Design a protein with these regions (language model features):
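Residue-level detector of anion-binding/catalytic polar loops
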Residues: 25, 81, 106
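Rossmann-fold NAD(P)-binding glycine/threonine-rich loop
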Residues: 77, 85-107, 118-127
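C-terminal substrate-binding/catalytic lobe of Rossmann-fold NAD(P)-dependent oxidoreductases
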Residues: 2-6, 10-50, 133-227
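Glycine- and other small-residue-rich loops at beta-strand/loop junctions that grip anionic moieties
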Residues: 60, 85-86, 112, 149, ...
Length: 227
């Protein structure tokens, strides 16, 4: 398959390596800052034109929350299947969904493409369902990533929160960032840390007076996100 990669940072390079190992042909890499990118521009329309001329049969977008909406708008009309790995843009999801329908295009998005993280979602959902019957347990989420990650909390943490809120009846509201020092019982907190080169760690705490149950997923590298 001929693939174009939009966003040629650490994840873009990792995606290229894995794509080639699987017998795919990366025909274009787009990034205004990467010295080894084959097309250097941040202009979404110019990127779309370059991709069309490259003969790409699939597009993988892994850029920045500030760029992803314009990229999607420019790329969908090409009619080429688009996979989006960028997080931090879900406030625009309704607009993007409408555009996808208007252009009769294919767009696939997930907060995290790691097999382990998607298994973790199911574990959290089941644990939250079990613990929901025990009022003595409180719950909170904490996540840590490298100090260059653009969004906070992570898209993965927000997705984990969805599973907790769906399955733990005592939690009905999500709070993150500057949350109150004394949260209400119904509030689910997400705490975020940005430090060093951490690929990604997510922990869900179920805490009571008697004990604490911790569920943690720790990524060892970015490779799991690119598989």
């Amino acid at each position: 398959m001929k693939i174009a990669i939009v966003g040629y940072g650490k994840m873009g390079h990792m995606i290229e390596n894995i794509a080639k190992k699987r017998g795919n042909n990366v025909v274009l890499t787009c990034d205004p800052y990467a010295e080894d990118a084959t097309f250097k521009s941040s202009d979404s329309e110019a990127i779309a034109k370059a991709i069309k001329e490259s003969g790409a049969e699939g597009i993988i977008e892994f850029t920045h929350p500030d760029s992803v909406e314009n990229n999607i708008k420019a790329l969908l009309p090409l009619g080429i299947p688009l996979v989006v790995g960028t997080t931090g843009w879900l406030s625009k999801l309704e607009k993007v969904t409408a555009l996808t329908k208007e252009t009769n295009s294919n767009l696939f998005y997930a907060a995290n493409y790691s097999i382990g993280v998607n298994l973790f979602y199911k574990i959290v959902a089941e644990a939250s369902k079990l613990i929901s019957d025990f009022d003595e347990y409180d719950c909170a989420i904490w996540e840590a990533h490298h100090n260059t990650k653009a969004d906070s909390p992570s898209g993965t943490a927000l997705k984990i929160a969805d599973y907790v809120l769906e399955n733990m009846k005592s939690k009905t509201e999500l709070v993150n960032g500057n949350f109150p020092c004394k949260p209400e019982k119904h509030q689910l907190q997400i705490g975020s840390t940005r430090v060093g080169s951490v690929p990604g760690t997510h922990t869900v705490y179920y805490d009571s007076v008697a004990d604490t149950i911790e569920l943690t997923h720790t990524a060892r590298s970015r490779e799991g996100f690119a598989l």
